[in-house]
Amino acid sequence: MPVPQPDGKTPAFGNLYAIGWSAVNFLVLLALMYKFAYGPINNMLEQRTNAIEGSLKHAEEVKLEVEQMRKETASNLAESRKEAQEIVARATKAAEESKNEIIAKAKEESTLIKNKAAAEIQAATEQAKLELKDSAVSLAILAAEKVLSRAINDDDHKNLVKQFVNEAGDLLC
């Protein structure tokens, strides 16, 4: 606002004078603020910028570490799964081998038992044949003695026995 003069008129340059002083005051205030306030504010903003950049770098490093740990964990998990599969495969193979071994032993034992039984049957059959021949010889001698009503001498006895055994052997076998 223009300042009125004592004569009541407002000078034309009165406002200019006030504007000039306002400009000078503004420039002085600006210089003082630049000197005393700009430096600390600028330093504070720079520190804040550095802190934010540091936090971002740290966050990026943490992100990379987490990614690396995730990859290692995935790798370890895959390796563990592979080891588990190998253990299962080895156990399955061992079980299969054990089963085959047990089956082979059982077959071998059954073959031995069967062969032993066959040998025992064969021996019993041979024994029965011998006993049957002995019985047949005794019966033949008795029958011959009764038929001839006399005792048979050794040569006759041997001839009769041989003949009877041969005939009986043909019939039995």
UniProtKB/Swiss-Prot annotation:
The chain crosses the membrane at residues 12-34. HAMAP family: ATP_synth_b_bprime (MF_01398). Keywords: ATP synthesis, Cell membrane, CF(0), Hydrogen ion transport, Ion transport, Membrane, Transmembrane, Transmembrane helix, Transport. F-type ATPases have 2 components, F(1) - the catalytic core - and F(0) - the membrane proton channel. F(1) has five subunits: alpha(3), beta(3), gamma(1), delta(1), epsilon(1). F(0) has three main subunits: a(1), b(2) and c(10-14). The alpha and beta chains form an alternating ring which encloses part of the gamma chain. F(1) is attached to F(0) by a central stalk formed by the gamma and epsilon chains, while a peripheral stalk is formed by the delta and b chains. InterPro entries: ATP_synth_B-like_membr_sf, ATP_synth_b/b'su_bac/chlpt, ATP_synth_F0_bsu_bac, ATP_synthase_B_chain. It holds the Pfam family ATP-synt_B. F(1)F(0) ATP synthase produces ATP from ADP in the presence of a proton or sodium gradient. F-type ATPases consist of two structural domains, F(1) containing the extramembraneous catalytic core and F(0) containing the membrane proton channel, linked together by a central stalk and a peripheral stalk. During catalysis, ATP synthesis in the catalytic domain of F(1) is coupled via a rotary mechanism of the central stalk subunits to proton translocation. Component of the F(0) channel, it forms part of the peripheral stalk, linking F(1) to F(0). It is found in: Cell membrane. Its main location: membrane. It is a single-pass membrane protein. This is ATP synthase subunit b. NCBIfam families: ATP_synt_b. It comes from Syntrophomonas wolfei subsp. wolfei (strain DSM 2245B / Goettingen). Belongs to the ATPase B chain family. One of its GO terms (molecular function) is proton-transporting ATP synthase activity, rotational mechanism.
